[in-house]
Amino acid sequence: MQDGSVTTPFGRRSMTLGMLASQYMSRELEPETSADKWKLFRALCEAKPKLGISERALSVMNALLSFYPETTLSEENGLIVFPSNMQLSLRAHGMAEATLRRHIAALVDAGLLARRDSPNGKRYARKDGDGSIDEAYGFSLAPLLSRAREIEQIAAYVKIERLQLRRLRERLTICRRDIGKLIEVAIEEGVDGNWDGIHQHYRSLVATIPRVATAATVAPILEEMEMLREEISNLLEIRLKIENLSGNPDQIERHKQNSHPESTNEFEPSSREEQGERPSPAIEPQREPMKVFPLGMVLRACPSISDYGPGGVVASPRDLMQAAVVVRSMLCVSPSAYQDACEVMGPENASAVMACILERSGHIKSPGGYLRDLTSRAKRGEFSPGPVLMALLRARGGSDRLAS
C-alpha cells in the first residue's frame, strides 16, 4: 500500500476482517522482500488444495500478474495493477464479468489480493512529471508477496504428501493383486478355510477406499490389507508344511527313528564309554523334535479354541492350526511372532500354545510378548506345551467338580 493506510472498498461492498488482516500483513512487508512472480504463481498452483482456491481463481491471478510490468515482485517496483474489467476478461480467456468479480472476491477473501479503490471506484494510475507512477488504484499484490515464503512451504508439503500418496497407492494396488490371486489359488487347490468370509472381508476393505483419497485415509486401509494378506499367506504356508510332512517318506522315517530312541542305527556311538556318556550341554536340545500332544488333550484343556475353527468346530490338527491363525489376529499377536513359534516348536505345538494363550487371555497383558518369551524358552529347551496343558486340565477338572 503506497501510503501505509487502511483502505475500504468503494460503493456497497462491505469491509471484512479478512480484508483488514490482508492489509495489515501487507503493511509489515519488508522493503527488500521480492519474489519471481511466475515461480511464486507455480507454487501457488501447487498449494491450491491447502489454500482453498479454485482453478478459475488461479486463472484470474495469472491474468493479474501478467499486467505487472516486471518479472520480480517488489515494493520498489510498486505492487498495484490496474486493468479494466474488459482487459482482465481478455487475459482470463474471455471470463464473464460476473464470474471475474466472484473470483476476485475469492482471492481477496483468501488473503492473496487486496483492493485499493479510487474515490470513484475506477482503476487507474496517475504519473508525475518524470513519467513515473505517483498514485495507482486497482489491485494490490502486496498480500501475495507477503505470503511468498508461506506459499512455498505449503507447496513443498503438498509435493511430499502427493509423493507419499502415490507410493501408498502403489503398495495398495500390489496388495490387492496379491490377495485376489492368493484367494483364487486357495479355492482352486481346495485349501481348508472360510474363504468366502475372507473374500467378503477383502471386498469390504476395498469398499472403504475413498474416490478422493489422501495419505491419511489410505494408510490405515493399506495396513488392514497387508494384515489380511499376511494371514492368507500363513494359512497357505501351514497347508504346504502339512503336505511336506505327510508327503515326504524320508521325513516320516526320521520322525519314526526319533520317536524310538532305544533303537540302534549306524550313527550310534561305537564304544560302551561313548554309549554311557550323557549328552553334552553344548548340544542344543531342539535338535530333537518337540513332542506333539494329542488334539483331544488340547481341546479338553482349551475348549475356547473350537469357536474359531472352520464352522465353529476343530475336528483335526489342520482345523486347530487355522483356528490359531484367527486367534493370533484377534489377540494382536504379530505374524512374525507366530511364524517364529511355528519354526521353533512346529506348527502343531505353536497352535496348541495359541489355544493356551486364548484360554488364559484374561490373565496375559501382552499375548504377543508372552508368545515370544515362550518361543525363546522353547529354543533353549526350557519350555514344552505339556505342563501348561496339564495345568489347564487340572484347573478345568477342579472347576467341573465345583460346578457339579
UniProtKB/Swiss-Prot annotation:
Q: Which domain of life does this protein belong to? A: Bacteria
Q: Where, by residue number, does the polypeptide cross the bilayer? A: none
The processes (GO biological process) annotated in the record are: DNA replication
Q: Which UniProt keywords apply?
A: DNA replication, Plasmid
Segments of this protein annotated with the region Disordered: 249-287
* Entry-linked Pfam families: RP-C, RP-C_C
Family recorded in the similarity comment: To A.rhizogenes possible replication protein C (RepC).
Q: What is this protein called?
A: Putative replication protein C
